[in-house]
């Protein structure tokens, strides 16, 4: 009489529960294998992640199941290789951190992020006194950022002192001056030359209805060593 074949033993691998389904993305909890909870043997809950056993990927410890799952059919008893989580490579824990950090906004929880996924650019608002003083100072400079004087320490030139007086960052003042030298702030018409060449040096300029201006500067604008780099991510309120 032939010996009755044993039933393949079932094992439960990584948790496949999607904790970010409401956000329209995929994020698991990083649990790599189902661990029975000895305190609730009949509940079938995982002691590691707290999810029901049905959320974990089921596998069989026999050659046929291994061949079907991983394509490495063997005659003996084997374990199927761990499949990557849907949506990308890497172990489940890495997928969990990537999805929670990118899609949720890095808030450390599903409900803690803003959901936008993008970084908002900063916006600077000026008082009327600041705008008036910057306009007069820019006209006196000829609407062009001057070079630093040789031998002077950084932050000891005329522009740095002016920025400290009015409480404005040097780079912010540079962007504001570039935005207004073409005539937008009334200073380009009176200064002549710099106003005429403003269009050639502007790489992008967008004016919105609320008066916000986002601008990028070409490296040729300033003769200053530190101020020659391209300015990105700055917005001004008129």
Curated annotation (Swiss-Prot):
The keyword DNA-binding applies. Residues 183-238 are annotated as: Disordered. SUPFAM superfamilies: Homeodomain-like (SSF46689). A zinc finger (ZF-HD dimerization-type) spans 12-59. It comes from Oryza sativa subsp. indica (Rice). Homo- and heterodimer with other ZFHD proteins. Putative transcription factor. It comes from the Eukaryota. Keywords: DNA-binding, Homeobox, Metal-binding, Nucleus, Transcription, Transcription regulation, Zinc, Zinc-finger. Pfam families: ZF-HD_dimer (PF04770). The homeodomain differs form the typical one by having namely 4 instead of 3 extra amino acids inserted in the loop between helix 1 and helix 2. InterPro entries: Homeodomain-like_sf, Homeodomain_ZF_HD, ZF_HD_homeobox_Cys/His_dimer. This is Zinc-finger homeodomain protein 11. The record marks 177 as: Required for DNA-binding. GO terms for biological process: regulation of developmental process. GO terms for cellular component: nucleus. It is found in: Nucleus.
